[in-house]
């Protein structure tokens, strides 16, 4: 059974969380845990915002939580501190998280004929580590993450590899 008609298709650019790895609940729980000491109402707002903005970087979420939900100042140091705490909560769990059902079979089949990439809002160093530990790195031409924006990553891939929009 053919999943994709790849007569014109030359490239696939994947998101990471919830697309290749079953990680959305791990991250949702970590956001709630980080903000639980502010009470149930803030935790509920944090969870709702996270679930409605899955493709946004954690730093942009932290800025929203701090400025809007808590009425607190936000700067790079605060963002980095929160991001480090968040990483400490999730990294081991992400390394143990299962792949989305069918991921490896799909990658095995299509990596032979197509160029595969990851463009994620997760920090690039974390995505690369997880992909390597799960022994998936040989399927991908490139693995990219934040602080770069997904749109910028896609533009870079198109430009460097000279792909046309109709080819992905």
Segments (PLM) and residue ranges:
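Substrate-recognition "cap/lid" segment bordering the active-site pocket of phosphatases
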Residues: 96, 117, 124-168
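Short beta->alpha linker loops
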Residues: 26, 57, 98, 102, ...
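Active-site neighborhood of HAD-like aspartate-dependent phosphohydrolases
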Residues: 2-48
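Short helix-capping segments at alpha-helix termini
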Residues: 37-42, 70-75, 135-139, 161-163
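Helix-loop "lid/cap" segments that line or gate small-molecule binding pockets
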Residues: 32-36, 57-74, 130, 157
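N-terminal polybasic phosphate/anion-binding patch
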Residues: 40, 44-56, 63, 67
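Short, acidic loop-to-helix structural element flanking the phosphoryl-transfer center
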Residues: 8, 88-118, 124, 128
């Amino acid at each position: 059974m053919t999943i994709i008609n790849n007569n014109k298709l030359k490239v696939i650019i994947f998101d990471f969380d919830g697309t290749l790895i079953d990680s959305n609940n791990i991250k949702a729980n970590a956001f709630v845990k980080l903000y639980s000491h502010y009470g149930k109402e803030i935790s509920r707002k944090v969870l709702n915002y996270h679930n409605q903005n899955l493709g946004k970087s954690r730093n942009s979420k932290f800025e929203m939580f701090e400025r809007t939900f808590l009425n607190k100042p936000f700067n790079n140091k605060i963002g980095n501190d929160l991001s480090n705490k968040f990483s400490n909560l999730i990294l081991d769990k992400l390394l143990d998280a299962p792949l989305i059902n069918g991921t490896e079979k799909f990658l095995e089949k299509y990596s032979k004929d197509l160029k595969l990439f990851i463009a994620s809002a997760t920090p690039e160093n974390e995505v690369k580590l997880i992909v390597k530990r799960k022994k998936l790195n040989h399927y991908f031409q490139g693995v990219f993450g934040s602080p770069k924006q997904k749109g910028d990553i896609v533009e870079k891939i198109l430009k460097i590899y000279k792909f046309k929009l109709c080819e992905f």
